[in-house]
Amino acid sequence: MIKSKKMFAISVFTALALYANAYADETKEKSEKNSLGSVEVLATESQEESYTVASMNTSTKLDLSLRDTPQSVSVFTKQKLDDLGITSYDEMLKRVTGVTLNRWDERLNSSARGFVIDYFKIDGMPSYSSYNARDIDLSMYERVEVVRGANGLTTGAGNPSMSINLVRKRADSKELKGDVSLKAGSWNSYSASADVSSKLNESGSVRGRVVVKHEDADSYMDNYKRTNDIFYGVIDADLTDSTYLSLGAAYQKLDRDGVRWGGLPAFYSDGTRANFDRAKTVSDDWTHWNVTTKSVFANLEQTLYKDIDLNVAYSYDKIDSDTALLYFAGAVNRFDGSGIEYMDWKADEQSEVHNLDVNVDIPFEIGGLSQQIIVGASYNLDKTTKYNGVYPNGYYSTLPNFYAYKTILPLASASDVPYIVEPEEIEQKGIYFTGKFSLLEDLKLITGARVSYWEYTSDNPANETRKFTNEITPYVGLVYDLNENHSVYTSYTSIFQPQDDKDSSGSYLNPIDGKSYEAGIKSEFLGGKINTSLSIFRIEQDNVAQDDPSGVFVPGTTTIASIEAEGVTSKGVELDITGQVTDNFTIDFGISNFEAKDANGDKYDTKASRTTANIFAKYVINNFTIGAGANYKSKYYTGSGLTKITQDAYTIANMMLAYKINKNTNLQLNIDNLFDKEYYEGIGNNSMVYGTPRSAMLTLKYSF
C-alpha cells in the first residue's frame, strides 16, 4: 500500500508539472494570434461526444470507414465507456455484442461465434500472455475497436472468433486540457484519477499527456480486496513537416487479495444442486493474484515521397504475476459440511512481449479513382517463464466443515516453496500485403495476404519444439455502395492456430485452419452519426486433431496418433445499431445469435450462450442525462445427466443518471444489476461462480 501511494503521489506531481508548463505560456498565448504554422493538430474522436468514429484500421491496417470494412465491427469510444461506467477490459467484454463469458476466478474466459478469444491487440499489435488475469485498466486507452470473425491478416496465429484492439491515448492537444475524477461506490470502492494534456514547447510541435489513477476496493465476496495503480505517459512530436514521433510508457500494478481459485462446489453429496450465499468463496485471507505490467512503446511516421508514408511501431511489455491460491474439491454434505478436500498452491509467472511492425502506405489513383496499398512485416516474441510450486503443504487435505471454515493453515513462505521452472517462448514473423482498390466508383475490393512463420520452444523436455513456416492467410472483401446511405459487402477471411498433436509418423499435424465467410449490409445516417450493420456468417475449422481410427501410437510413445479432420462449424447473424439519433438522444444496440456444431453434429461449447443482446440509451434534458440499458444472455450449460449445470436465460439491467453542475463539472451515478439478479457468471466441472450483485458507482468529474 505504501508503495502504491508513493507511485500515485509521484504521478500526480508529474501531471501538475505538465500543467505548470502549460500555464506558464497561457498569458502569452492569449495575446498572440493562434497560428499553427507547419504544425497541424487535428481534432480527434476523443473530443467528440460520440458513440461512433470516422474510421478504424484493426481489420486490415487500412483506415476504413465502418461502411467500407467488409466485416462486422463495433467501437467503444471514450464517451461510450464513460456513460456505461466501464473502466476495465473485463467490464467492457460484458457489453460487446456476440461475446459470451465464463469466469473461472480472476481468469475470465471469453468467446465469440463459438470460439475462444485467445488474443487481443494494443495499437494493432497482438498480445497473448496471461491477458485473462490482467483485467487491463482502460483509462490509458482512447477507444476499443472490435472486429468479429477471423483476423489473421493483421494478427498471425489465433482463433476465428474476434479481434479486440485497444487504441492508446495520444498527446493530441496544443492547449492545456484534461480532467480529474473522483469515484466512490459499493463495497468501499474508491478511486482518483487525472488525465492531463498540454504542449511542451512554444510552437506546440512537442506535446505531452499523463494519465494517473489509484483505486482501492473491497467486494461482496468474503476476503476479497483489490488495489489498482496506473501511470501512463506519452510524448508526441512533429520533428519536421514530414516526421512524427511518439514515445510512451505505461504501468499497471493490480493487487488482489482473498482471491478464489475456481468456483464453489456445484453439488451436495446427495446429488442435489448446492446453494450458497454469493459472498462465500473458495479463498482465504492469504490468497492473492497480483499482476504488474510495465510497457514502453514508440511510433514513427515518416513521409517518404508525396503521400507515401513509412510507419514503424515497437512495443515491449513485461508482465509479472504472483499467485498464492487455495483449491477445493468434492461434494458438500448438506447437513454437516463434510466431504471437501483442499490444497494450496504457489506460482509465479514472468512474460516479456516484443512487437515490431514496419509498413509502407502507398496511395495512388487509377482512372481518377483512389487506390491504396500497404506492404509490411511484423515480428512478435512472447517469452514466458513459469515458476510452478509443488503444493507447499502437501496435495489434498480434508476440510472438517465447509460451512464453518474461516481460514486454512497459512501458506508456506515463498522461500520455502520449491519451484519447477518452465521457460518457453513463441516467435512469430510475418510479411503482409493489404490494399483497397476502387474497381468502380461504387465498388471497392479490400484484399490482402499474410505469410507467417511460427515457432514454439521450451526448456521442458516434455514440450518439443514446434515450427510452422509459410502459413498463408488470405483476405478478400467486396463492398458495393447501393446509394449515399447503404452498402452491401461480402468477405472471406482466415486465421491459423498451431496444435501439438502428432500423426502416426511422429510429425506434428498442420495448424488448424479457421475460415470465416460473411455477408451483410451496412448503413449510415445523419452524416455518419448513426451506423447500422446486419451480417450473416459461417465459420469453418479444418485440420482439427482427431484420434487415428487405426489406433496406432505415436512412435516411441503410448499416445494414440492423430489425424487431421473437419472441425467445428459455426453460423449465425448479428445486428448493430449505434449512434446519435438527435442532439439529445443516443442509442447503442446489438444482438447476436449463432449455432456451433462439431463434425459429428453435436453442439460445441455449450457453456456459450447462443443468443446475446446489449442495449443502452441515454437522453439529455437540459443539464440532466438519463441512461438505461440491459444485457441479455440465453441459456447455457455444461455436463450431462446428474452432473449437468444449467444457467437459464437472464437479463441484467443497468442505469445511469448524470447532472452537469456547470460547464466543467459533472456528477454521474451508475447502477449495475439494477434488480439484483442472481446468476452464474461461470460454470465448470462441478463448480459455479456467482455474478456480481447490484452495485453503484458515483463519479465526480472536473474537465478543463
Describe the residue ranges of each PLM region.
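N-terminal Sec signal peptide and the immediately downstream disordered periplasmic leader
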Residues: 1-84, 90-97
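Periplasmic plug
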Residues: 75-78, 89-95, 101, 108-150
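Outer-membrane beta-barrel translocator/receptor signature
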Residues: 139-142, 153-231, 239-243, 294, ...
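Acidic/polar loop-and-plug regions of large Gram-negative outer-membrane beta-barrel proteins
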Residues: 215-219, 232-303, 318-351, 395-420, ...
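Structural signature of Gram-negative outer-membrane beta-barrels, strongest in the C-terminal barrel
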Residues: 238-240, 351, 370-382, 422-541, ...
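Face-selective signature of the C-terminal outer-membrane beta-barrel domain
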Residues: 296-319, 342-459
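Membrane-embedded beta-barrel scaffold of Gram-negative outer-membrane proteins
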Residues: 301-303, 309-315, 319-325, 488, ...
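Gram-negative outer-membrane beta-barrel transporters
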Residues: 440-442, 563-641, 660-666, 675-678, ...
